[in-house]
Amino acid sequence: MDLAPGRRARLLVALALVVLVALAARSGAEVITLTEETFSDKIKEKDTVWFVKFCVPWCKHCKNLGTLWEDLGKVMEGADEIEIGQVDCGVSKPVCSKVDIHSYPTFKVFYEGEEVAKYKGPRNVESLKNFVSDEAEKAGEAKLQDS
């Protein structure tokens, strides 16, 4: 396909805009995949609560979650200092061993490098949101008391 230079430039600009709009729609709403290389540094981030799902692709209980974790990521998009993460224990086995994962799915909250809670409640967005928000509030209060 041979395009005139002006038409080619317009096509490239249009394509770039489509990509930017798609990326903007996803920014802040995505669940962050944590790996052996990134897990420790991320969960140690100052003043940041990490709510992490540990799963493996072959687990029927993980599959039954459907889009729950992604939906939580979207709902928590505007939440200050709360990040939603996930670890594939099939790929990042050392991470899952380090934090004592023995069943799937497992949901844990980390604050400044330490595990502060494990979620065992209902599997719906509202319950997950309330849980991690409460844990973030507790972490903030504990930090103020330590100061």
From Swiss-Prot:
Any one GO BP annotation for this protein: protein folding
Keyword annotations from UniProtKB, A to Z: Disulfide bond, Redox-active center, Signal
GO molecular function, one term: protein disulfide isomerase activity
Pfam name, any one: Thioredoxin
Statement: the UniProt record of this protein carries the keyword Disulfide bond: yes
Site positions for Lowers pKa of C-terminal Cys of active site: R123
The UniProt record lists the keyword Signal: yes
Active site, UniProt feature: C59 (nucleophile), C62 (nucleophile)
Signal peptide feature range: 1-29
Disulfide bonds: C59-C62
GO cellular component: endoplasmic reticulum
The Thioredoxin domain, residue ranges: 30-137
Entry similarity comment: Belongs to the protein disulfide isomerase family.
Its job: Acts as a protein-folding catalyst that interacts with nascent polypeptides to catalyze the formation, isomerization, and reduction or oxidation of disulfide bonds. May play a role in storage protein biogenesis.
The protein, known as: Protein disulfide isomerase-like 5-1
